[in-house]
Amino acid sequence: MAAATVNPLMSTLKSDSSLQVALHPLPILEISDYITRSYLRGYKGAIVGALIGQQNGRQITIEHSFSVKTEHTGQNYKVDSEWFTARLDQMKAVHKDRALDFVGWYTLVPKSGPTDAHLPIHSYFYSQNESAVLLGFHIHEILNPVAGDPLPLTIYESNLEIVDGTEASTVEVEGEDREMKDVTAEPSRSIKFRELPYTTETGEAEMIALEFVREGGSANVTTTATNITATEDEGSDKPLMKKVVDTNKGSKRRAVSSDDAAAEAPTTSSAAKGTATDKNRDANLTKAELDYMSALQAKYNAVQMMKKRLDTVISYLQRLPPDYLSSGDASSQQQQQQQQQQQTEGLDQPQYTVPSNKILRQIQALVTNVQLVMSNSTSGQGQGQGERDTDLGALEKELLKETNDVKLVELIADLMSSVKDMKEVGKKFHVVETAKNSKRREQASHGGGERFNPHHPYPGGGGGSSMMREHAGLVGEGSASGSGGSGPAGDLARFDH
């Protein structure tokens, strides 16, 4: 029997590094999204990315990741060093509050472990960080998932181990001649990988993101809703699938069942098949519309699940023995009559469910609490139109009151903002006026302050003393007839004289 194939890059020694790796869910989402987008776009290159986190001694946390640009050189790929350095600096700047740094890289790895194609890239990352780990995604486990299996990934550490050439032989024959080696020669070393155990940690922000993914975001819109619509058949619970097909008769289309479409498929000509194109009707929808469709789909699924649960409860109650039903109930009397009729006719008695008091109490509590979760307008069947209108009016008043409260809060916020702006304007006005007053006081203290203005009626621009102005006026009045001049110019001339 042939020996099992052993990966030569996997170390046979146990790990003595005692590394403890904590994996966060956000890198897993980013890596899976990158793989999905690459597959849908038909990407033919290498799927390689970097892992950033914290490394405290022997403890490593993997918190974020980003894709890495690679170049194809012959048979292998290599990392664009300049691009990687620039992108790593950007990621460090974004997460500088957490002091995140490069701790490893990820790629697609077979279940048996890394291959020779991974060594050039790992050697580059090993030069950046000797403790860099390799997160290998197993694509085959992603394509063929099995319930209960762990995450389709493995984390490896790398070490330089001495290779003496005997590891290539997996079976050692007793008594076989072996080559003598020079013990003084320096032994060769090669990179070997070892599997590392890891734990998962989740932060508060990551829990919010996972909750959004679990509930179904805008990217979770079902693809079957674009061309296929499901309608419930009245006679059975199986949905009838209908598909919009082109009948090649003008521009009209009609909805036919899947069986009819399969029957009509052979009659379609090859030319029509070549020219027919399936257009996605959701291609031009906005994000808000996609979110609305996703919310409607989630509500539809919830209603369907509730309907199935109610059908199960009704079926359970219908299969209870007649003695567990009230004697005054019409349905119980009808069941007793049917049972007596079957006994007289010799027919087989129906199989009743084993009653459970716990289940019956839960059903009773559910029926009792129905009135608490339903509105008054839908709780009773005998309400008149006036009462329903009253309930609707009360609801509209409540909505109007809440709307007014919200708008009032907004107006108060705007008013407070305006008051704050007015206070700032008042402070600036006070500073300007204070500066002007101080300047005027300085000019007055220097005896006029301004230069001589020939167009001003008094020298000094009105900044001089009152006695000088009175003297100038007296001189002007006493010599008005002798000077032959009048007005401000004459006054100035007489004052100069």
From Swiss-Prot:
Instruction: Enumerate the UniProt keywords alphabetically.
Output: Cytoplasm, Nucleus, Signalosome
- GO terms for cellular component: COP9 signalosome; cytoplasm
User: Which residues does the UniProt record annotate as the domain MPN?
Assistant: 21-162
Q: Which InterPro entries match?
A: JAMM/MPN+_dom, MPN, MPN_CSN6
Q: Sorted alphabetically, which CDD domains does this protein's record hold?
A: MPN_CSN6 (cd08063)
> Domain of life, per the record?
Eukaryota
The record's listing under PANTHER family reads: COP9 SIGNALOSOME COMPLEX SUBUNIT 6, EUKARYOTIC TRANSLATION INITIATION FACTOR 3 SUBUNIT F-RELATED
Function recorded in the entry: Component of the COP9 signalosome (CSN) complex that acts as an regulator of the ubiquitin (Ubl) conjugation pathway by mediating the deneddylation of the cullin subunit of SCF-type E3 ubiquitin-protein ligase complexes. The CSN complex is involved in the regulation of the circadian clock through its control of the stability of the SCF(FWD1) complex.
Task: Report what the protein is called.
Answer: COP9 signalosome complex subunit 6
Organism annotation: Neurospora crassa (strain ATCC 24698 / 74-OR23-1A / CBS 708.71 / DSM 1257 / FGSC 987)
Classification of source organism = Eukaryota, Fungi, Dikarya, Ascomycota, Pezizomycotina
